[in-house]
Amino acid sequence: MQNIKCVVVGDGAVGKTCMLISYTTNGFPSEYLPTVFDNYCANLMLDGKPYSLGLWDTAGQEEYDRLRPLSYPQTDVFLICFSIISQSSFENVSTKWFKEVNHHAPGVPIVLVGTKQDIRNDNDSIKKLKERNIELVPYEKGLEKAKEINAIYLEASALTQRGVKNVFDQCIRSVIYPNKLNKKPKKKTCTIM
């Protein structure tokens, strides 16, 4: 059985822990408890082969900025999460999270996840958000950001479990098929004769 280490990062309260609990227990937590550090493990079959997926849940709060990178050594894949209802968490993907993981673990595959995807189809929630001048991060912006950081982009909802299994399947695939999923842009060369 191949072991794969997946470290989950992103701003506080974007839904990292909820997504992990939803995936590992098929349930949704009833209250928000900020994470300091947690581990989960999922044994599964993918493409006919067994895997042990070690899931490392990290704290997104600034006060853990010095502690969090201690979980990065030997990481096989990073999940960078943002909430589709939080522009600041989306902006922090490139200004904080990508910089941090790329500094400590350059070249490790990344899956970018827009959480709380169920809200896209909930007109009541969208109306309430608009009343508070909160715009959803468009799906296309997520795709653009993923391309910018050389990541795969997915959206998921821990509440409805839509897309959650696919997120973790893609984490495994990005490790076992690295060149197929995380294509690096080809560098152009200049030859002088």
From Swiss-Prot:
GO terms for cellular component: cell projection; cytoplasmic vesicle; cytoskeleton; plasma membrane. A motif (Effector region) lies at residues 32-40. Belongs to the small GTPase superfamily. Rho family. The modification Cysteine methyl ester is found at C190. The gene is racF2. GTP binds at residues 10-17, 57-61, 115-118. The keyword Nucleotide-binding applies. One of its GO terms (biological process) is small GTPase-mediated signal transduction. This is Rho-related protein racF2. Pfam families: Ras. Its main location: membrane. The lineage of its organism: Eukaryota, Amoebozoa, Evosea, Eumycetozoa, Dictyostelia. A lipid is attached at C190 (S-geranylgeranyl cysteine). SUPFAM superfamilies: P-loop containing nucleoside triphosphate hydrolases. InterPro entries: P-loop_NTPase, Small_GTP-bd, Small_GTPase, Small_GTPase_Rho. It comes from Dictyostelium discoideum.
